[in-house]
């Protein structure tokens, strides 16, 4: 086959320049493996909040703050107190009302201007511990078009502000203050200049292994592939002075859609800490998603040190606080992320669950304690508070596996394989003709209409009204049935080597050519009063039909299944 050749587009690519790669031929991060969780910092209440159409009011901020604390985040950027009275008041509120646990450190952001730094220190008075996060932009573009300053001018802004921060520590003697510095627009800054500014700031602050500073390296705008960001982080880790006294922090954004990858590769490259938001809210395309990063660790058997066991509650709180919906396809938290519509996917998932149950039993373990290994599901939904209810849903792309899964899990009917195939054709015909999705309730209604006539929706020529049987060990069963034929009740007798065989002989004598080809049954629930489901594959007038019967008595259930098959054949 000759594949068609792609042709040039009309996109104005001449207006854009490729990002220059970093010369790091001896990079080591590709050969490393993540083995533990990073130091996390949530910036939902600052970076996330400033990106909202309707910024959070105090109740929404409190809900978010309490959620973050409950989940286990120990560093929380709670605002930009010099930027708005609302942020300042919120910082004061959580301090004065003693809402900050002793093991949680609040973080506050400030620009590199004296008046703003002073206001920031005023906001943290009375707190037990706080991180003052200082930033100024260092990128080549902003130096030229925003500040009109050379490198020395930009570096002086940073070091002057660092000195002011250091001097103001004495104004909050009751607070253990730590410092963080961000060369904002780091990804647009020459690495040599970025490390020069960071080292100059640290020369002012003079960190020690006992009192570390945080050097935060933000992808304020994501400008290249994640491997380039990782190269830059490894280069910085090699060239930062006094590295043992510095916490290297990442702050990826998602402009190119690879924020999570950038964070994970940057962490491999030597970073210690990651800043982000729950579900990735933030400026433009958002910050890196802490939910995705954290649960990614869980799927590799690494404790994230964060509690994601009730992801729906996390999502509800985040949606309330942000007034933004979490998309259906957002990793781990979206409504559809554990849902399979594809027939082949559904079949694989169903078989995976069946196989895992067998493996767990063989290992002497409960299924919930056994190693998770289900096709298409990287994590057990139950482990993050989701259910299996939405794992498989039925539409026109679904196959027998999905139909069988729902019938078993929603309606407790474990359909034999050939019956799965037969019934799925009915579902396929309905979805093809009507479109859309079929709910578990719809599925049951279709199944009843096809196999199980009820008092409310009767159909079929025959109905079994009653039966009695007698048998002696080693001899045929003698059966008497009350059979309704088009409303007329007939008492019929016969015998055979079992109840089903006796019933078929009775029907043969009545003029219905029926033979049982295969038979399955199971209890619908545990206990002495459980009903039984019987599935019989029958040959009727030379054609094959399945019948289904449900009854507290297993014999009655099997005879009902024969009647079901006959009624379907002549319907």
What are these regions (language model features)?
Residues 2-46, 301-493, 528-531:
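A mid-to-C-terminal "edge-of-domain" accessory segment
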Residues 6-9, 14-16, 40, 56-75, ...:
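Alpha/beta enzyme core
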Residues 47, 51-52, 81-85, 139-141, ...:
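Short, small-residue-enriched loops and turns at beta-alpha junctions
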Residues 103, 142-145, 217-219, 247, ...:
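Short beta-alpha connecting loops at secondary-structure transitions
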Residues 224-359:
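Catalytic alpha/beta core domains of metabolic enzymes, predominantly
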Residues 467-477, 486-488, 493-546, 552-553:
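A conserved regulatory-domain signal marking ACT and ACT-like small-molecule sensing domains
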Residues 544-546, 550-571:
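Mixed-charge, glycine-accented linear interaction segment located at domain edges/termini
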């Amino acid at each position: 086959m000759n594949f068609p050749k792609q042709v040039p587009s009309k996109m104005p690519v001449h207006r854009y320049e490729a990002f220059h790669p970093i010369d790091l031929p001896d990079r080591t991060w590709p050969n490393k493996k993540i083995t533990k969780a990073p130091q996390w910092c949530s910036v939902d209440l600052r970076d996330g909040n400033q990106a909202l159409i309707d910024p959070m009011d105090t109740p929404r901020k409190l809900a978010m703050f309490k959620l973050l604390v409950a989940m286990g985040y120990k560093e929380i950027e709670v605002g930009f107190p010099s930027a708005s009275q609302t942020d300042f008041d919120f910082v004061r509120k959580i301090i004065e009302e003693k809402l900050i646990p002793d093991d949680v450190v609040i973080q506050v952001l400030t620009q590199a201007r004296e008046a703003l730094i002073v206001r920031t220190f005023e906001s943290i008075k009375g707190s037990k511990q706080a991180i003052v996060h200082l930033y100024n932009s260092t990128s080549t573009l902003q130096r030229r078009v925003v500040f009109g300053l050379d490198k020395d001018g930009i570096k002086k802004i940073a070091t002057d502000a660092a000195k002011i921060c250091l001097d103001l520590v004495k104004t909050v003697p009751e607070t253990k203050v730590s410092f963080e510095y961000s060369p904002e627009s780091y990804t647009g800054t020459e690495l040599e200049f970025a490390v020069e500014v960071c080292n100059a700031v640290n020369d002012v602050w003079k960190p020690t292994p006992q009192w570390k500073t945080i050097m935060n390296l933000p992808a304020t705008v994501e400008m290249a592939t994640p491997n380039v960001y990782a190269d830059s982080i490894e280069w910085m880790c090699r060239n930062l002075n006094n590295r043992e006294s510095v916490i290297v922090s990442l702050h990826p954004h998602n402009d190119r859609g690879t924020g999570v990858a950038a964070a994970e590769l940057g962490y491999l490259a030597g970073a210690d800490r990651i800043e982000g938001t729950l579900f990735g809210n933030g400026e433009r395309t958002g910050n890196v998603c802490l939910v995705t990063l954290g649960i990614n660790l869980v799927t590799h058997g690494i404790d994230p040190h964060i509690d994601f066991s009730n992801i729906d509650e996390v999502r509800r709180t985040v949606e309330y606080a942000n007034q933004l919906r979490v998309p259906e396809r957002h990793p781990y938290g979206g409504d559809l992320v554990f849902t399979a519509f594809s027939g082949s996917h559904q079949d694989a998932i169903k078989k995976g669950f069946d196989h895992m149950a067998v493996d767990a039993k063989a290992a002497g373990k409960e299924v919930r304690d056994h190693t998770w290994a289900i096709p298409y599901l990287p994590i057990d939904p139950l482990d993050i508070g989701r259910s299996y209810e939405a794992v498989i849903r039925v539409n026109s792309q679904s196959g027998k596996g999905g139909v069988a899964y729902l019938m078993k899990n929603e309606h407790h009917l474990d359909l034999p394989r050939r019956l799965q195939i037969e019934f799925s054709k009915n579902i396929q015909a309905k979805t093809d003709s009507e479109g859309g999705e079929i709910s578990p309730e719809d599925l049951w209604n279709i199944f009843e209409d096809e196999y199980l006539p009820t008092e409310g929706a009767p159909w079929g020529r025959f109905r079994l009204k009653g039966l009695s049987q007698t048998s002696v060990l080693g001899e045929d069963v003698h059966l008497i049935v009350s059979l309704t034929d088009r409303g007329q009740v007939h008492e019929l007798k016969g015998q055979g080597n079992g109840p089903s065989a006796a019933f078929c002989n009775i029907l043969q004598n009545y003029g219905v050519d029926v033979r049982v080809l295969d038979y399955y049954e199971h209890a619908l629930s545990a206990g002495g009063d459980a009903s039984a489901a019987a599935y019989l594959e029958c040959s009727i007038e030379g054609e094959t039909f399945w019948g289904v019967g449900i009854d507290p008595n297993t014999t009655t259930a099997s005879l009902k299944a024969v009647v079901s098959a006959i009624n379907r054949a002549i319907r």
